[in-house]
Amino acid sequence: MLDIHNPTTDHQDIRDLTIIGGGPTGIFAAFQCGMNNISCRIIESMSQLGGQLAALYPEKHIYDVAGFPEVPAIDLVESLWAQAERYNPDVVLGEAVTKYTKLDDGTFETRTNAGNVYRSRAVLIAAGLGAFEPRKLPQLGNIDHLTGSSVYYAVKSVDNFKGKRVVIVGGGDSALDWTVGLLKNAESVTLVHRAKEFQGHGKTAHEVEQAKADGLIDVHLQTEVASIEESNGALTHVHLRSSNGEEWTVEADRLLILIGFKSNLGPLAGWDLELAENALVVDSHMKTSVDGLYAAGDIAHYPGKLKIIQTGLSEATMAVRHSLSYIKPGEKIRNVFSSVKMAKEKKAAEQEKKAE
């Protein structure tokens, strides 16, 4: 977990920008605030920064972020924070924003479920898909007592699957990634998917097919989990059923269900902001239907939107950049080149050190 403290001592101390959400997009937005010489405060509902990457997939490897041929999710989060941390953004953890109010002077108040109110000159919503919970298999009934010991909806540590007989349910990117990713750790891996074809990335799907051809895994398409067996509070068997009615049983110690998440905008849905496809509609400046209120990342919607990390980082840059005209009206917005800015900061730090 990142070593982050909360330096906020006065909730009424106004900041230039409130960033709602501390996932990759929100963290990078904080860095961009520093680059553009404005203050910010991140408010994150969870107890740590990083969003789903830190909470659900810390050991998952990511391949589609520029400059990183391959990077574990938690390492990407730590790298993003290393960038943002140099500008000392305020960070509020464990508080969910429930309401915002735009005041007569154009500034904003954001209220959290802890009863705290934070003021800023503008707001950037980078809350991902909102609150999320894993999709479950209704035919299995209530299996909460097995969750975290035999049944999992995410891989937080591969050690939980080391030497185990694992049944994975799903056909998307996560299911395919972990089918390949757990090969080195699990005793056996069985992949079950109810459709005829995988929905995940073609490259990973090919790797799964190759592993099947090599006899490293079992793959059952057009098949679903019918029921499970347990003994002394631990999973022992998974019963499978094919689309043609054939049934059989596999021995299993772990059931990894990776069939996606249900997202819920929560209070955001009642904020009188224009919505489309369960997201906030933004213009080319990442502005929502309310002046001074911006959105970036998965929570933002516009024609042709791609919901990937790389897009969110770009949108964070644009949102912060365009928020300057609202935060500092009348001021000329100048281009900021990172190499020049960093050189000036380094020189200033050296001069300050000499003066001591």
UniProtKB/Swiss-Prot annotation:
One Gene Ontology molecular-function label: NADP binding
Cofactor binding note of this UniProt entry: Binds 1 FAD per subunit.
Cofactor: FAD
Keywords on record: FAD, Flavoprotein, NADP, Oxidoreductase
InterPro entries reported in the protein's UniProt record: FAD/NAD-bd_sf, FAD/NAD-binding_dom, Fd--NADP_Rdtase_type_2, Ferredoxin-NADP_redctase_2
SUPFAM superfamilies: FAD/NAD(P)-binding domain (SSF51905)
Binding-site residues, FAD: T25, E44, Q52, Y57, V97, F132, D298, S339
Reaction(s) catalysed (UniProt annotation): 2 reduced [2Fe-2S]-[ferredoxin] + NADP(+) + H(+) = 2 oxidized [2Fe-2S]-[ferredoxin] + NADPH
EC number of the protein: 1.18.1.2
Family stated for the protein in its record: Belongs to the ferredoxin--NADP reductase type 2 family.
PANTHER family found in the cross-reference section: THIOREDOXIN REDUCTASE 1-RELATED-RELATED (PTHR48105)
HAMAP family (alphabetical): FENR2
Subunit note: Homodimer.
Protein name (record): Ferredoxin--NADP reductase
Organism the protein comes from: Chlorobaculum parvum (strain DSM 263 / NCIMB 8327) (Chlorobium vibrioforme subsp. thiosulfatophilum)
